[in-house]
Amino acid sequence: MTRILKVKPTRMELLRLKRRIKLAEKGHKILKEKQDALIMEFFTIYDEALALRREVNQKIAEAFEQLRLAEIDVGIVKLSEIALSVKSNKEIKIKRRNIMGVPVPLIEAEGFRRDPYERGYAFVSTSPKVDVTAETFEEVLELVTRLAEIEETLKRLAKEIEKTKRRVNALEYIIIPRMAETVKYISQHLDEMERENFFRLKRVKALLEAKAQG
């Protein structure tokens, strides 16, 4: 049995609770719509994440195959020298955007791809295979950065969905039922009081009439 709220069983309290129930039902409807929309958005992004994860895995495999070919072409020692001469890539800038009020990361992943001059090994004797290897790993970097953004977005959306679900369930299964049960209790109490008052007045009237006739 649903527990009732600890309130005075008065008509004023009854009206106040009825207003609270209407507000709670409206809030429940809004939160349920938000929850449903968040779930739809989550699965849309989830599908994108799965596709991107496959692309990342394929690109990583391709990058290591290019690295193997470059090592065969110039040798491990030369390849190590070239790697040590490469300049650091651009810094990643993390901004923020909102998805239905949920703050999620926005990572600027442009500008990772560079030419040999920007990488810093243009004047070192190298080979086209080294360039292809560098380009492929830069593509990996772009994809991995994008994947990190999407996966963090999914984590935050999942957290918000769970939070919203708890609020929806609290309203649906605890708060609204308790208020409704309390309204029922107060209504029954007031009806009982009205009946008692009616019979009391009826008895008083009968006594007064009997006294008047005697």
Swiss-Prot record:
Chief location bin: membrane
Gene Ontology BP term (one): proton motive force-driven plasma membrane ATP synthesis
UniProt cross-references to InterPro entries, sorted A to Z: V_ATPase_D
Cellular component GO terms, alphabetical: plasma membrane
Alphabetic keyword roster: ATP synthesis, Cell membrane, Hydrogen ion transport, Ion transport, Membrane, Transport
Domain of life, per lineage: Archaea
GO molecular function, one term: proton-transporting ATPase activity, rotational mechanism
Bilayer disposition of the protein: Peripheral membrane protein
UniProt keyword Nucleotidyltransferase, yes or no: no
Locations listed in the record: Cell membrane
SS bond partners: none
Role according to the record: Component of the A-type ATP synthase that produces ATP from ADP in the presence of a proton gradient across the membrane.
Family: Belongs to the V-ATPase D subunit family.
Subunit structure as annotated in this protein's UniProt entry: Has multiple subunits with at least A(3), B(3), C, D, E, F, H, I and proteolipid K(x).
NCBIfam families reported for this sequence: PRK00373.1-4 (NF001545), V_ATPase_subD (TIGR00309)
UniProt protein name: A-type ATP synthase subunit D
